[in-house]
Amino acid sequence: MYTVADLKKGLKLTLDGAPYLVIAFEFSKPGKGQALYRTKMRNMITGVILDRTYRSGETFEPARLEERRMQYLYKEDTHYTFMDNQTFEQVQMDEDAVGDAKNFLIDNLEVDILLFGEKAIGVTLPNFVNLRVVQTDPWVKGDTSGSDSKPATVETGYILRVPPFIEEGEMIVIDTRSGEYSTRVKG
């Protein structure tokens, strides 16, 4: 059990049966009366943000979250399917819960899935992924009038800016945290 004194940014707790992440916290002690704890929390399933004020002595349940290593299998309609490599158990996530991670998911990619009970509520990607460029404009040697980058589409449909020497069919390394080109795959 957490008390209001335990509240801080980044704390994960259960409120009304759903997991919440504290994203802002403020303590105030008026001249007379009890101390007040103002919080801003994000529902980890729906993304809804709550503003709540609590008084000293109130308690909260910690969020029972588990992170498991899983393998991305496939997408069907708006659902993404992942498999636990130890138990071979499969879980599905809605496109909204997957978020921007969908731009970097390729078959058999190992990811960490955040579970609340049996419900998958989040995906943590590796910091870098290798993806194949499927469409980009050709580079004209000696063309110095253009910029130092050009748009490219990778196999997942994600569009990013790459250096002009990158060609269709090449494998590139993308930083999943920023979504930017990192380097060309060697070999």
Curated annotation (Swiss-Prot):
Coiled coil: none annotated. Involved in peptide bond synthesis. Stimulates efficient translation and peptide-bond synthesis on native or reconstituted 70S ribosomes in vitro. Probably functions indirectly by altering the affinity of the ribosome for aminoacyl-tRNA, thus increasing their reactivity as acceptors for peptidyl transferase. The gene is efp2. GO terms for molecular function: translation elongation factor activity. The keyword Cytoplasm applies. This is Elongation factor P 2. SMART domains: EFP, Elong-fact-P_C. It comes from Geobacter sulfurreducens (strain ATCC 51573 / DSM 12127 / PCA). HAMAP family: EF_P (MF_00141). It is found in: Cytoplasm. Pfam families: EFP, EFP_N, Elong-fact-P_C. InterPro entries: Elong-fact-P_C, NA-bd_OB-fold, Rib_uL2_dom2, Transl_elong_fac_P/YeiP, Transl_elong_KOW-like, Transl_elong_P/YeiP_cen, Transl_elong_P/YeiP_CS, Transl_elongation_fac_P. Belongs to the elongation factor P family. It comes from the Bacteria. Keywords: Cytoplasm, Elongation factor, Protein biosynthesis. PANTHER family: ELONGATION FACTOR P, ELONGATION FACTOR P (EF-P) FAMILY PROTEIN. Pathway: Protein biosynthesis; polypeptide chain elongation.
